[in-house]
């Protein structure tokens, strides 16, 4: 299988940089997979789990929004937050979800809609983390 270069960058660190076979990305308009030779485009990310496939092994990384650019040079993702499953503190993640739920009653209109959407994404990530497929 042909490979391509992939960079995953967050404000804190370079979370990944290297040659990969495939990257499955949680896009705002729907999830998408990237292989070598993919057509160029730019997409926004939603909070979700990014899957990086290299040599038959998969690495799961949680991203909490950002921007993806596919070009002839490869795939670059600028993520708001990028945390590997190994680094994730699931208790802190659950606490974050509880805090988001508690603050919903303080929001109205579009702000409430965005908060509910973000909470739904976080709950989906939590549900995926609790399945045996990710362990």
UniProtKB/Swiss-Prot annotation:
It is found in: Cell inner membrane. The keyword Membrane applies. It comes from the Bacteria. The keyword Magnesium does not apply. Its main location: membrane. GO terms for cellular component: plasma membrane; proton-transporting ATP synthase complex. Keywords: ATP synthesis, Cell inner membrane, Cell membrane, CF(1), Hydrogen ion transport, Ion transport, Membrane, Transport. GO terms for molecular function: ATP binding; proton-transporting ATP synthase activity, rotational mechanism. It is a peripheral membrane protein. It holds the Pfam family ATP-synt_DE_N. Produces ATP from ADP in the presence of a proton gradient across the membrane. Belongs to the ATPase epsilon chain family. F-type ATPases have 2 components, CF(1) - the catalytic core - and CF(0) - the membrane proton channel. CF(1) has five subunits: alpha(3), beta(3), gamma(1), delta(1), epsilon(1). CF(0) has three main subunits: a, b and c. This is ATP synthase epsilon chain. It comes from Bradyrhizobium sp. (strain ORS 278). The gene is atpC.
